[in-house]
UniProtKB/Swiss-Prot annotation:
InterPro entries: UDG_fam1, Ura-DNA_Glyclase_AS, Uracil-DNA_glycosylase-like, Uracil-DNA_glycosylase-like_sf
GO cellular component: cytoplasm
PROSITE patterns: U_DNA_GLYCOSYLASE
Function of the protein: Excises uracil residues from the DNA which can arise as a result of misincorporation of dUMP residues by DNA polymerase or due to deamination of cytosine.
Name listed for the protein in its UniProt record: Uracil-DNA glycosylase
Keyword DNA damage: yes
Organism in which the protein naturally occurs: Oleidesulfovibrio alaskensis (strain ATCC BAA-1058 / DSM 17464 / G20)
Coiled-coil segments on the chain, per record: none
């Protein structure tokens, strides 16, 4: 295996220097394992997009963290940002509910606006570029097998990313949706940051507390109270 195979998915320098496990190279064995798996299986997201969340959102810009579980496992969906799909791709059910809730917080926009998939709404890169870290706890997955890389070793790395944000950033809103994400609450210093928890936006649970949770408006109000710009959801 060439060095280019391993480093095609290198994290950006700011994160690599700040996150202890990245600085120590703990991600390299994981990338090697993923590279081996790609030889015989389809793995998402595509090569070069594994650390997209970190590339889109520099550490010093982080003001919101949304924690996902693992990448979408369908063709053409995963591109390295939790809950997001590329522009023009039909939104999976969980993303539809995220967009619906975000749109419902805009008094000037009908809730149905979040259901569109022919505009920028399905690609959450604009959120990421405003400092919203869209982080899955497992950064890769095998096609058609949800959770297949959960035991690969990503969780130690992504836990360290969350911990680093909590330690280094002055004021961040952490949105933890569903039991898996809520387990990460222990990594967050709630004396400095705002923790917003809810059920998962999956259609199986969204109507049990996610839709109508008000997380997006709560986050912006909390940020504004600290002199920070609100996120344009």
């Amino acid at each position: 295996m060439s060095r280019s195979d391993v480093f095609a998915d290198a994290p950006p320098a700011d994160w690599a220097q700040a996150v202890p496990l990245l600085r120590e190279g703990a991600h390299l064995p994981l990338l090697r394992s993923v590279a081996r798996l790609r030889r015989s299986k389809t793995v998402y997201p595509p090569e070069g997009q594994v650390f997209a969340a970190l590339h889109c959102t520099p550490l010093h810009t982080v003001r919101v963290v949304i924690v996902g579980q693992d990448p979408y496992h369908g063709a053409g969906q995963a591109h390295g940002l939790a809950f997001s799909v590329p522009q023009g791709v039909k939104p999976p059910p969980s993303l539809r509910n995220v967009l619906k809730e975000a749109a419902a917080q805009k008094p000037e926009a009908p809730a149905a606006a979040g259901m569109q998939h022919n505009g920028v709404q399905t690609d959450l890169t604009p959120w990421a570029e405003q400092g919203v870290l869209l982080l899955n706890t497992a950064l890769t997955v095998e096609a058609g097998r949800a959770g297949s890389h959960a035991a690969l070793g990503w969780h130690a790395v992504t836990d360290d990313i969350i911990r680093t944000v909590s330690e280094r950033c002055p004021a961040v809103v952490f949105m933890l949706w569903g039991n898996h994400a809520r387990q990460k609450a222990a990594l967050v210093d709630t004396g400095r940051h705002l923790l917003l928890e809810s059920v998962h936006p999956s259609p199986f649970s969204a109507h049990k507390g996610f839709l109508g949770c008000g997380h997006f408006v709560t986050a912006n109000s909390w940020l504004a109270a600290r002199g920070l710009l609100p996120v344009l959801w």
